[in-house]
Amino acid sequence: MAEKKINFRYIGYGNSFADEYWKKEDKVESNLYLFSDNRMKSVFVKKMKKDIFSKQPEFLTMNEFKERIFISDKIVLKEAKRILAFYKSIPQDVKEELNIKSYYDIIDFANNFFAYYREMNINDIKEIDNIHNWQEKYFYYFNRIKESFDILCQEYNYIPNDWLEDIKYFQTKWLEKYRKIIFVDVIEYPEIYKKIINKLLEEKEIEIILQLENGDFDEKNLKIEKITLPETSPSK
């Protein structure tokens, strides 16, 4: 890890994250707050944005953050377009073996395909060990289609949006204006984001605030180890 350390903060169950960031220095525009989802972001922003005439920090979900830091000059395929490209990539013998007659037969299969290779990539996994017998045929078909799909993408300069989360597409220019990045109740950090945080620590202050007991989160490996539930009074 980098010489600079992540600052970890923990709050109790029932407490508000926004109440932890009430100081003037918490509300400067050089702060970037990142959230796991829109619900958490909306609650936080509603409480923090008191003075509409002053400059504010930036508030983004992790999905919005990803769209700004992973940049490629390739043609990015989203939603139905990436599934259509997948369909065109399926070798004829595979279509026959799987009884694929139309685009609509493979929508779920295609989404699983993109999700599988995304997980492999963001967690830096080269190969899956201990595959069950019933899984072997699926991985066989995935590998066959992947070979064909890669050729199509190379020919037309395509990339599915699922696969943009790659360190080779990571761009720091947009982040230059921020001095501090705060991850608000973000509890999952795939390998690629550990690398990105390590890179950002060279120039920025990084803070992670979680609604957990101190000791429940592995601060070295950035993952939950256990969950300590709050004590409740026995009913009378």
Describe each PLM feature range:
Residues 192-236:
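Conserved RecA-like helicase ATPase core segment
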Residues 33-35, 182, 206-211:
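Structural recognition of the conserved hydrophobic beta-strand(s) that form the central parallel beta-sheet
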Residues 1-3, 22-30, 171-181, 200-203:
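Flexible, charged surface loops at secondary-structure boundaries
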Residues 38-176, 191:
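Basic/charged alpha-beta structural segments of nucleotide/phosphate-handling enzymes
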Residues 28-41:
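Conserved RecA-like ASCE P-loop NTPase motor core of nucleic-acid helicases/translocases
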Residues 2-21:
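Walker A/P-loop
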Residues 185-192:
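Short acidic, Gly/Ser-rich segments with clustered Asp/Glu that frequently serve as metal-coordination loops
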Residues 29-31, 54-57, 204-206:
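Short glycine-/polar-rich loops that comprise or flank the Walker A/P-loop
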